[in-house]
Amino acid sequence: MFHRIGQFVVKRAWWVIVAWLIAAVAISVTAPKLASSDDESDFLPRHYESIVASDLQQQAFPEAFTPSAMLLFQRTDGGQLTADDKAAMTKVTDGLTAEHIQYVQTIVPVNDKSISKDGKYALSLIGYDKNAPQSNTDTTKKLRDDAKTLAGGTDLKVQLGGQAATNLDQQDSSSTADALIFLGSFVLIVVILAFIFRSAIISILPLLLIMAVIMPTSNALIADATKLFGLKANSTMSAILIVVLLGVGTDYFLFLMFRYRERLRAGEPRKQAMVSAIGRVGEAIASAAGAVTVAFAVLILSSLGLFKAIGPALAIAVVTTAIASITLVPAVLSVIPEKALFWPGKKWRVEKPGARFAALGRMTQRRPGLVAAVSGGFLILLTLCSLGYKGTFDLASGSMPKTKESMVVQNTVMSAFSAGASDPSQVYVTSTNGSPLDKSTFPAYTAALGGVKGVSEVAPQPLLSKDGMTADFSVTLKDDPASNAAIATMDGLRSTAHSAAPAGTKALVGGQTAVEADINAAMDHDYKTVFPIAAVLIMVILGLLLRSVVAPWYLMASVGLGFGATLGATSVVFQKFDHQSGLMFMLPIFIYLFVVAIGTDYNILMIARLREEAREGRSPREAAYEAIKHGGPTVASAGSILAASFATFMLAGNVLFSEIGFSIAFGIALSAFVMAMFFTPALTALLGRMAWWPGHQEPEPVAPGQWTERDELVAARYRK
């Protein structure tokens, strides 16, 4: 099939190029704008308790004041606030109120209750119109700028924090991160390609095709799918898409380019060489893309909206890239003369001895048992380190630098006031018998909630709805609302809230900590559902590719070890050496996405080469030698580019991207340089022909570089 695709693409190269350009423009112009959300509650299904509580709050207390932002006041000299300072703070809040800033509904003046115990800090809470669009940042920018202007000429320093300010800072941080990641990936890919091929055109061509055609097409299709299926996008998605498109697109380009150069060196005419390259590597690209796409698409089964959106989005990006890699890319390459393509290199036709990879192949050929034991033992050792993994749920502080103003405010509020005061939990008690709540039961219920371990205080008077059917008990926790300790408190708080609820009522616990506790539960569900389904589907794809029921098992086992080893190494680096309390809760999913899914690419490329060598009549150990000798440079180059691309995440300057960057770069390196280069060939050599059971049938031996009769017939068409 791929030979026929190659013939069509090469014969009608200009038609293929024009068709791609027209399709890219048409799809991009008609696509909707992709809006994103960073509100964690947006990513939970509606049946979780925290979401049900939020819905109840909106119904029972439609006029309730919910602060969207907060002004933090302090003296510039760090001293205690004076009477003059309090007057200046009133001037600031009154001035902002008088401006009637769009969507600002309420600005609460500073009072005695909003001043810290040490007298150095004061808070003014700000409420937005509930109908204000979440994507609106102009209101928050104006509030921040005008507050600083009004505080000018005083001894006060004023900063804006809260959810609205966090959203603004996350957006700014995300834009900066995207630019740094794109620039870093671009430069690294150009340098690595230039080093590999010594060619001006090859070093820049894949990036031009990705940026000009593949990326706009993918982004437009993702926007269409997101709107069509009502999915939620996240600011993290854009940075990940950049790296996936650049990294995976360049990887598939390398898969094709190495084979194309190999066939040219074997003496095939230019156009026939491209047909042969597509025919030989097309199946590997399609299978690799299929495995990655399935792994990504399975995330549609996730409980979390974040992964429901990012999985299909990445699947669309990979499918688009794979289709372009076997149509657009070969069409462009086939119209470029060989001298121009490889300029200024002059010795590209001469195959280098490849002594390093030949030596590695020879080592595996001679001692496959030792190679399998050492590489497998290394993976197992790192996997054991994953037992120390701990998750943390403070997504806001993890997704941007701690120097951002909203983060400074958050940390100051937690230290100057009660740690949980920045975002109290809410316990809603609502009548189930149609009668108004009995207020006489409130004191006992308040006392029961206050007795829960981890609770700092409970507001003495709950807020009662107008119809008297629902009461809101505000509960301040002892710990930071986003901390693991606060999330652990949720179990006890929910248990007490439910069991101590007065007769004829039911209780629901809401608030940010409750949302994060539910996210934790949803993640546990996803680990038990998504991972096994993805593993089974990837094994099916591997079985279809290899016509074997044996090889998929040890290939998936090696990928599983790669996942565990990556998580273990990341846990050691960030928890042990960087002294972090835990890794971001979503990190295991990201490791799964890229190490399991994309890491399978390199295993597929190597196992496909092993099968090809075996079909040419070589013994299992000889096949391992030839596969590493010829496939090793491709795997090493592709792995280096993708690992380097993900390493650029660490340029973003925030905890989440640093963890993602390190873990995925390390995992990709493991996949390429340990699993695909040593573990998989060594195991295949040890298993021998049993690895291909029952589908392997050995044809007549074909010497390396020898054309088959089919190749000769196809080549005749291009010798005019």
Predicted feature descriptions by range:
Residues 1-37, 102, 131-391, 502-505, ...:
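Membrane-embedded transmembrane helical bundles of large multi-pass transporters/channels
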Residues 46-68, 76-167, 388-582, 604:
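Structured non-transmembrane domains adjacent to transmembrane bundles in polytopic membrane proteins
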